[in-house]
A protein has these predicted regions:
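Residue-level signature of the C-terminal ends
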Residues: 342-350, 380-388, 438-450, 462, ...
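Nucleotidyltransferase catalytic core that binds NTPs
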Residues: 715, 719, 725, 729-971
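Short inter-helical turns and helix N-cap capping residues of alpha-solenoid HEAT/ARM repeat scaffolds
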Residues: 328-329, 366-368, 406, 421-425, ...
Length: 971
């Protein structure tokens, strides 16, 4: 018999069987047979106990049923988990532990499993894609790692048990259950997007905590509400400072949002009932600001859950990639890229490799912007490819999570980009090569600081080879400026210098232009380097600068930056003073045969001539740049032209600015979309240099345009204008009210996009609001708050919740997510949203067949008196044959989409103004606010409802807003 008794001996014996590394527990192999006999007997009696006693949430496990198992793709893994759970006698182990240890592991694990399954089963009833076997296995296994901690690791159990849980799951081939079980820390909520199973487990674990000890010193397990549990944990956290408390409050807010989302679905979270308790959904038009914020949160969480469900399943992820490959519309491709950019950090290694292959293929895409976006994302994905073990590791443990690391992948893709397959045509080779610098920049910006040098080394190896063909040499030269020279030692820099010096002798204009551009950019940092100056002299001696004005200009700039004497001052003087040079540049830049590097240098020369005070035809230069922006085949030339044009804008007179703006606007209207899509990025900035009068005319022209093809690019333009609108007041001081009214006008134009009848325009509106406004840093937090206040309720009304295609769903998910990030950040910083809402409601009923400009002006006038106006559309008219109700409602939607505080009254709540019961219901819909009736004077004079005897809640008891109408008699 063991000296400490059988139970402690069996307890240690079982733990050592589960975790053989527990050498701090004495070996007890001699008890194998006794343990097997005892455990089988114990299992028999515990089974009988379960049959006779009612279910206990701190003792029993309600595992997934056969029906639930049949719906899961993880059926095999879950059955394997149940077998492992049984073979290891884990339940019996926890029951023995309850008898001999002060802590009660069983009560905690069973409690977490109970809450998790209680919630998960209800969510499934609401249509949320929760995998019940997956969450059941993860909840039952989430703390098994506590048995793996050695005696000397007891103090670190809260931090180390995640590793040992993951270890047990990996040993038993439970990868999906293990991934969720081992990542249930509240700090895992700092990841922006998690699967619903992970959220449920973290939520359940958060609520089941120690609630003290009984008189025998045994742990009492408590089931807390979310708020109570937060207070308990905050009191227990070690080394709590303000930063850590804020960090904890941030993750708690994520759980709170998730709980509120579940409550909105009718999920019972207080464990009193398994039946759903649906909460009636109010129409978005009737929500106050707090309810609107909650609605945004719930929609974003719902979309995230559904998208993460698709991305976390191998089969559905493959379907998404296949759909992305097969699309022919570049905007659809952009939507897929946006989803991958937002969610790729949650992909597993295999999914990342599949996505990277797709991105590589996209670098052959005919649209330059798609190639650039794919290259940026490829670099970012390589930088974040390695799975980092985020939890604390035991001493002397080194985890190898994948056979392939990011450095091996980087070498592979470097080779595929620089030396593509021989079957790739020349044009695609060049497109692919031009992407290299984007990949390098993105990789070095997103990787860890200490890893940057390691990523640069494989790239430098290509510069040691001097036998490249011309096109490969040009690609490497074009990429060289993206290598941070500060990372390199002298020998590595000399490799780059020698590479440029060697290829300068090639009689290829674009190679020589690339070399001189590189030297020009490097010159300020290396004026003291003898090797660099030697390279400069060697290159300038070889390059025939006299024959090409662009090269001569760069040679002049290099000598000036390096402090070298100018050899041919007359030639350089000619570059800056001869008007014929400008004419030649205008001609060369519009020729297809001119290398794109030369075009970029020419634009730089034109701008430098203007800045140096040389008399120049500025308007001619500006229109030339606008032409390049509209028609250049090379995307880099378009962007260079646009950037130069915006820099030139302050130097133009007001009439010249207006002329250029009109020219660019025509480009929006008459150009094919594949060309005009580049204009908004720069037109939106440029028009903010127009005089207020001309700017208002520009906005009005875009608003009144009937050209369908302009709709999407107009939205993009308005988005860019909003990004930079904060600078306008300093350029043209005007009354604050005028400035704000114009901002609202621009925001209203974007809202109109949500009401457009074309699906692609609606998607573009969502893209502009989500990606261009809320996701970017152009706007301050206060500006975003004002934007949210203007857009939010209308967005909820106009964005159709029935997403008819997967692509629309992806687009909406990204948009809602960007707004949700802002909401979370703002509430964390400011605690809550505060907006001043009108306290008076104007109820404006009518047939509105048609809805005229007169109706719209009346609604505006009432709104400006301090009302929120609700247009109540009659289902039909007794007096005339009206258009179908849905047609009239659609027209109303489009007509008032851009108007602040003018909404459509919910069609599912008809109000008969002659019925006091309906009018009572109307008052109750706006608690704390005064409801006014809006009517024409002829209606008040003739309508039967005004001839009835007054009674409580009749129309005569409502205050009115009456607009005068002339009768046929002229009164």
């Amino acid at each position: 018999k063991p000296k400490d008794g059988w139970l402690p001996a069996l307890y240690g014996h079982m733990i050592r069987k589960i975790y053989p590394h527990r050498d701090d527990i004495p070996a007890t192999d001699q008890y194998d047979k006794a343990a097997a006999f005892y455990l089988e007997c114990l299992r028999f009696f515990l089974k009988k106990e379960k049959e006779r006693l009612p279910f206990s949430r701190i003792r029993d496990f309600d595992f997934a049923t056969e029906e639930e198992l049949a719906e899961s793709p993880y059926e095999e893994e879950y059955r394997r988990f149940l077998q492992c759970f049984s073979d290891a006698y884990l339940y019996e182990l926890m029951r023995i532990g309850r008898e001999i240890m002060p802590f009660d592991m069983l009560a905690h694990v069973a409690g977490v499993h109970h809450i998790a399954m209680h919630i998960a089963r209800q969510l499934v009833k609401t249509g949320i894609p929760v995998d019940l076997p997956l969450i059941s296995g993860a909840a039952a296994a989430h703390d098994i790692g506590k048995y793996g901690c050695r005696e000397n690791e007891v103090r670190r159990i809260p931090y180390l048990h995640y590793y040992y849980t993951d270890l047990w799951c990996r040993v038993h081939e439970l990868p999906n259950i293990g991934h969720i079980a081992a990542n249930h820390s509240t700090w895992d909520l700092e990841l922006e997007n998690l699967t619903v199973e992970s959220l449920i487990l973290i939520y359940a674990d958060f609520r089941v905590k120690n609630n003290g000890y009984d008189e025998k010193g045994k742990e009492i397990m408590g089931f807390y509400s979310l708020a109570s549990s937060f207070a308990v944990i905050l009191n227990k956290l070690d080394n709590v400072d303000t930063a850590k408390e804020n960090r904890y409050r941030h993750v708690y807010s994520r759980l709170e949002d998730f709980e509120n989302y579940m409550k909105a679905l009718g999920v019972n979270v207080d464990l009193t009932s398994c039946a759903l308790q649906p909460i009636p959904q109010r129409n978005p038009a009737l929500l106050n600001i707090d309810e609107t914020v909650d609605a945004f949160k719930n929609i974003a969480i719902d979309h995230n859950i559904r998208l993460m469900h698709k991305l976390s399943r191998e089969l559905t992820f493959g379907d998404i990639l296949e759909a992305a490959r097969s699309t022919r519309n570049w905007k659809d491709t952009r939507a897929y890229l946006n989803i991958f950019a937002e969610y790729f950090t949650y992909m597993n290694q295999r999914q990342k490799q599949m996505a990277m292959n797709f991105l590589y293929d996209l670098m052959f895409h005919r649209e330059g912007d798609i190639r650039r976006q794919a290259a940026d994302l490829l670099g970012n994905m390589i930088a974040h490819y390695d799975v980092e073990y985020g939890k604390e590791l035991p001493q002397n443990v080194n985890v190898i999570l994948d056979e392939t690391d990011s450095f091996q992948l980087w070498k592979r893709y470097l080779d595929r980009i620089i030396l593509p397959d021989h079957k790739v045509i020349d044009r695609h080779r060049r497109w692919l090569g031009y992407c290299l610098k984007r990949v390098v920049i993105s990789l070095l910006e997103n990787c860890k600081e200490e890893q940057r040098k390691r990523y640069v080394v494989p790239l430098l190896a290509y510069y040691q080879e001097l036998g490249w063909i011309d096109e490969t040499a040009f690609i490497l030269l074009d990429t060289m400026p993206s290598i941070p020279m500060a990372l390199l030692d002298d020998a590595e820099r000399n490799v780059c210098f020698r590479f440029m010096e060697h290829f300068a002798s090639r009689d290829v204009l674009e190679i020589q232009a690339a070399i001189l551009l590189n030297l020009c950019e490097m010159a300020p940092a290396f004026t003291e380097s003898k090797e660099f100056l030697h390279t400069v002299n060697g290159v300038l001696d070889v390059v025939p600068a006299k024959e090409e004005k662009a090269l001569a200009y760069l040679a002049y700039e290099i000598r000036k930056n390096c402090g070298l004497p100018q050899k041919n001052k007359a030639a350089y003087q000619e570059i800056f003073e001869d008007s014929a040079v400008v004419s030649d540049i205008f001609l060369d830049n519009l020729k297809a045969a001119t290398p794109w590097k030369i075009k970029i240098i020419n634009m730089r020369l034109l701008y430098d001539r203007i800045c140096s005070g040389v008399t120049m035809p500025k308007l001619h230069v500006a229109t030339h740049l606008s032409n390049l922006l509209k028609v250049s085949e090379q995307v880099s030339v378009r962007h260079a032209a646009g950037e130069t044009l915006v820099k030139l804008a302050p130097m133009l007179s007001w009439d010249q600015r207006n002329e250029v703006a009109i020219e660019l606007t025509k480009g929006l209207e008459i150009g094919e979309f594949e060309f005009s899509k580049y204009i908004p990025q720069y037109l939106g900035e440029f028009v903010l240099f127009l005089h207020p009068k001309e700017l208002d005319e520009f906005i009005k022209d875009l608003e009144n345009s009937t050209n369908d093809r302009i709709a999407s690019v107009a939205l993009d333009t308005f988005g860019v204008m909003l990004q930079h609108y904060g600078q306008y007041q300093s350029r043209f001081p005007e009354l604050a009210q005028v400035y704000e009214d114009r901002r609202k006008k621009i925001m209203g134009m974007i809202l109109k996009g949500f009401a457009n009848y074309q699906e692609n325009v609606k998607r573009e509106a969502f893209w502009v609001v989500g990606h261009e406004l809320f996701a970017q840093d152009y706007l301050s937090m206060q500006e975003k708050k004002n934007l949210f206040g203007f857009l939010s309720k209308k967005m909820l009304m106009l964005v159709e919740q029935d997403e008819d295609s997967e692509l629309t769903f992806f687009n909406h998910t990204a948009g809602w997510n960007f707004v949700y990030h802002f909401i979370s950040a703002y509430i964390f910083q400011e605690k809550k949203f505060t907006f001043s809402e009108p306290q008076k409601i104007a109820f404006f009923p009518g047939t509105f067949d048609p809805f005229t400009l007169g109706h719209k002006e009346i609604a505006r006038e009432i709104r400006d008196l301090g009302f929120t106006v609700y247009l109540a559309l009659d289902e039909f008219s007794w007096s005339k044959k009206a258009q179908p109700h849905r047609v009239r409602r659609r027209i109303l939607d489009m007509s008032v989409a851009n108007e602040e505080n003018i909404f459509l009254f919910p069609s599912d709540t008809p109000i008969n103004i002659a019925n006091p019961a309906d009018l009572k219901k109307l008052r109750e819909m706006f608690p704390g606010k005064e409801v006014y009736m809006v009517a024409g004077s002829d209606v008040v004079q003739n309508a039967s409802s005004y001839r009835m005897e007054p009674e409580e809640n009749s129309i005569m008891t409502f205050p009115h807003v009456i607009f005068l109408r002339e009768t046929r008699e002229g009164r």
